Regions:
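A beta-strand edge to alpha-helix "cap/lid" segment located at domain peripheries
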Residues: 1-27, 34-127
Length: 127
């Protein structure tokens, strides 16, 4: 069994962030998706709030420095270190990030959780 479907969905998820493409995002996100950030404090952003934020999440550059993918049955975990330059709600959100995505295979692969830890970036602005 290959991971082609998973890899295609992972590429689509990255593309929806870069292009701020809500329609593509809705096809990739699990219905129970949430973004979990940890710096400076734990914050959970549910799917509807993340989709609402997407137009104001402007990525100027995105470089994957490290990538590791583990797959077991219908669960996959992707770990990445990302160097990103971005503006979120008008605030600079550039820096290094450690990102772990949990993917679930149901009708298709969907990202269920993204855990993002900013190593060098400023805190997310208040929403």
């Amino acid at each position: 069994m290959t991971n082609d479907g998973l890899l295609a969905q992972m590429a689509a998820y990255e593309q929806c962030v870069l292009d701020r493409d809500r329609q593509l995002a809705e096809s990739v996100l699990h219905p129970d998706y949430a973004l979990v950030t940890t710096n400076p404090a734990l914050m959970v952003t549910p799917r509807t709030s993340w989709l609402a934020l997407l137009p104001d999440y402007i990525v100027h550059s995105w470089a994957v420095e490290e990538h590791l993918l583990d797959v077991r049955g219908g669960t996959a975990v992707a770990f990445q270190r990302i160097d990103m330059k971005a503006t979120v709600l008008g605030t600079d959100r550039s820096g290094l990030f450690l990102i772990s995505d949990v993917w679930l295979l149901e009708d298709d692969w969907r990202v269920w959780r993204r855990h993002s830890t900013a190593i060098t970036a400023a805190a997310l602005p208040a929403q």
